[in-house]
Amino acid sequence: MRSAPDAHRRGRPDDEVNRMTGNGNNPEVKIAAPEVKRLRASGPILILAVLFVVGAFLTWYFTWFGRDLSDADISQYLVDQKHPRRVQHALLQIQQRLARGDPTVKWYPQIVGLANHPETEFRLTAAWLMGFDSNSEEFHQALLNLVRDPEPIVRRNAALALVRFNDPSGRPELLAILNPYVVTTAAEGEVASTLKEGSALARGTLLARITQPDKKTVEVRSPLPGKLDRVVATSGSRVAPGVAMMTINSDEDSLWEALRGLALIGEPQDVPAIEPFANGTVVESDRIKQQATLTVKAIQSRAQQNPT
């Protein structure tokens, strides 16, 4: 009986050798393919997968601001202050109805109440929304309070909304948008920061950490979107309460909105602050340069028509 080649015998039993002898030297011998066993997903795994997908969808669905809300939903969401996104969703839905001129819009007392809420997100959204009904005196009075809010983002929204009321009370705040915002600290200690000048910032971006004498750490976050203009307190330096740490340039959208507002309520003495944006010495955006040019022309034209 002829045996298999020695190369196939080393360390292998005869039955394994017989299975592996099909090769180029023995084309008449077929290699037996191993049986493939398919694993079937068990019922519990499928159920868990379905629940995961459904849960993710429901989370998205109930937090997606594009979803229409009924009157009952809006009333419920406005008082659900444990879930800020629900409150904001309701406010957005009200804004959309106001923008469409829907005469059935209600909830004005709730909106004014949110304008006095300690949560910044509620105040800034309420300030923005109230500009969509310039006939409401209760909104007007609420905005006059919000334009003095401690948070700059709330003041800015209120100032822009007041323009719709043809009220120039927010003019100083609109001019402030054109200038770098100074970030100060209420804490004393050593600064630690890795941000570089020119870094893009979102509202809430961590600007620095301050290690106090008692070793506790205080975080300093950006109150506004924009770009880091100048670092005053460098990493490793010590600061005291009220000291300037850095300055922030406003983002393009804020600049554009401020310039649009000043086109309506700006004064001739505001022109020198606007012209650098028109000639491109401050920013290179064509959008900003164009709007700044239009704003200067609007202010000058209004001054000529109404000389003092």
Q: Over which residues does each language-model region extend?
A:
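N-terminal intrinsically disordered, acidic low-complexity segments at the extreme N-terminus
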Residues: R2-P34
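Amphipathic alpha-helical scaffolding segments comprising HEAT/armadillo-like alpha-solenoid repeats
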Residues: R38-L39, W64-L78, R100-N116, S134-R148, ...
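Short inter-helical turns and helix N-cap capping residues of alpha-solenoid HEAT/ARM repeat scaffolds
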Residues: K82-H83, P118-E119, P150-E151, Y181-V182, ...
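Residue-level detector of extended alpha-helical repeat arrays and alpha-solenoid scaffolds
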Residues: R86-V87, R123, R155-R156, L255, ...
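Alpha-solenoid repeat junctions
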Residues: I94-G101, M130-N135, L162, N166, ...
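Short beta-strand-turn/beta-hairpin segments enriched in glycine/proline and small hydrophobics
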Residues: A176-V191, L206-G226, T247-S250
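Short histidine-centered loop motifs in beta-beta connectors
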Residues: T185-A200, L228-S235
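A structural signal for short beta-strand/turn segments enriched in small hydrophobics and glycine
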Residues: G198-L207, G236-M245
